[in-house]
A protein has these predicted regions:
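Residue-level marker of alpha-helix boundaries and capping positions
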Residues: 96, 133, 153-154
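Zn-dependent metallopeptidase/amidohydrolase metal-coordination segment
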Residues: 68, 152-181
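Anion (oxyanion) recognition and catalysis
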Residues: 110, 147, 167
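Short glycine-/small-residue-rich flexible loop motifs, especially phosphate/cofactor-binding loops
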Residues: 106, 143-144, 163-164
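Structural element of the ATP-grasp superfamily
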Residues: 23, 45, 142, 165-166
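Midchain, well-structured core segments that form catalytic/ion-binding scaffolds
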Residues: 1-128, 157
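Short, low-order "capping/linker" segments at domain edges
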Residues: 127-145
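Residue-level recognition of short, structured coil/turn motifs
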Residues: 57, 147-151
Length: 181
């Protein structure tokens, strides 16, 4: 069979977008005894992560710091720390709200004189302004074909698939039976 049932939603009709960043903080650091009181990149990074986690995300939105690293030894005030941060949503306004919160956190720490570099690692768009009537027509046709083939109703849901690009540009799209995870 070219089409198979998957354990997730069989038809993806809503695109979940994501933005991913590497954030690097650099400070003067120094020896933990002789330079005590110097700024610690890890402490600033921990504080920034705490600030990022203060937002109550909109419905259908998530965020995560998945990796953090930094420092060189137990007796060295960390000069550098990095984290990988992402947020995801199936709504454009929520993506912009999350971006504004991220930008505000970065700006706050830059104003403290901390050197911060932000590298965009990836950006996948979410659903844009899709004509609801045309999208529904496509879903109805696909659902009928699904019923004819499998003998049951299709399950519609959201996910990150090849449909992200057309859906983000307002083009009605579906991803059929090839999404798992």
């Amino acid at each position: 069979n070219a089409i198979r049932k998957s354990s997730a939603s069989e038809m993806i009709n809503i695109a979940v977008g994501s933005r991913r960043f590497r954030v690097t903080i650099e400070t003067e650091g120094g020896h933990s005894y002789n330079a005590f009181g110097n700024r610690n990149a890890i402490a600033y990074m921990a504080s920034m992560i705490d600030a990022l986690y203060t937002i109550k995300p909109p419905t259908g939105t998530s965020y995560n710091v998945g990796v953090i690293q930094g420092g060189t030894s137990v007796n060295t005030i960390a000069q550098k720390a990095e984290m990988l941060y992402e947020f995801r949503s199936d709504r454009m306004d929520a993506m912009e709200q999350m971006q504004a919160h991220f930008d505000a956190c970065v700006s706050f720490y830059r104003q403290k004189g901390v050197r911060i570099e932000v590298e965009v690692l990836g950006e996948r768009p979410c659903t844009g302004d899709v004509d609801a009537v045309e999208q529904q027509k496509m879903m109805d046709k696909a659902n009928q074909a699904y019923q004819d083939y499998f003998g049951c109703e299709a399950q519609f849901g959201s996910g990150s698939t090849d449909c992200n690009i057309p859906l983000s540009r307002g083009i009605p799209s579906l991803c059929l039976a090839c999404y798992n995870g």
